Amino acid sequence: MKTCLIVDDSRVIRKVSRHILETLGFAVSEAENGKEGLDACMASMPDVVLLDWNMPVMTGIEFITQLRQRPGGDKPKVVFCTTENDVAHIREAISAGADEYVMKPFDHETLQIKLQLVGFA
């Protein structure tokens, strides 16, 4: 089964994302910030990470930078899901190692398309 880790400080976004992902056949886990997300990845590397930008403790950019610097071959696809919608943020995310970028709010179809673009859904 495909696995996805949702890293977002919003309980509502995690709930909505979980519902969409489960209908697409993903087993879903959650983290409230980048630090929890990194810990979850080290315990069990997911296939995909849905990642928020602005979170307490550790931001999405800090998360992806540390994740991509870790040794080893297992690296998940990372889709930023954020309200940061300017070109500078998109470039920064892609440069840091993001595979896709989707603006909040998003719907089922948009998320499904983004997941297809990174090889899932």
Locate each region found by the language model.
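C-terminal output helix
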Residues: 106-115
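Charged docking surfaces used in two-component/phosphorelay signaling
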Residues: 15-23
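Alpha4 helix (beta4-alpha4-beta5 surface) of REC/receiver domains from two-component response regulators
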Residues: 62, 85-100, 110
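Helix N-cap/capping motif at the beta->alpha junctions
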Residues: 30-39, 60
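Short amphipathic alpha-helix used as the core "switch/output" element in two-component signaling
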Residues: 39, 61-74
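Receiver (REC) domain active-site loop signature in two-component systems and cognate sites
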Residues: 55
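Active-site beta3 strand of CheY-like receiver
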Residues: 44-50
